[in-house]
Amino acid sequence: GIPCAESCVWIPCTVTALLGCSCKDKVCYLN
């Protein structure tokens, strides 16, 4: 539920994905 300051509209979460973030509603979120 916490925004990870990375979008995933065109490409998946990259750097923030390593921190455990995942794509939701075009934005990378962590819980």
From Swiss-Prot:
Annotated SUPFAM superfamilies: Cyclotides (SSF57038)
Post-translational modification (record): Contains 3 disulfide bonds.
Bridged cysteine pairs (disulfide): C4-C21, C8-C23, C13-C28
Cross-link (Cyclopeptide (Gly-Asn)): G1-N31
Pfam family, one: Cyclotide
Family annotation (InterPro entries): Cyclotide, Cyclotide_bracelet_CS, Cyclotide_sf
GO biological process, one term: defense response
Assigned keywords, A-Z: Disulfide bond, Knottin, Plant defense
Tissue specificity remark: Expressed in root, seed and nodule but not in flower, stem, shoot, leaf and pod.
Family label: Belongs to the cyclotide family. Bracelet subfamily.
Role: Probably participates in a plant defense mechanism.
Note on domains (UniProt): The presence of a 'disulfide through disulfide knot' structurally defines this protein as a knottin.
Annotated protein name in UniProt: Cyclotide cter-D
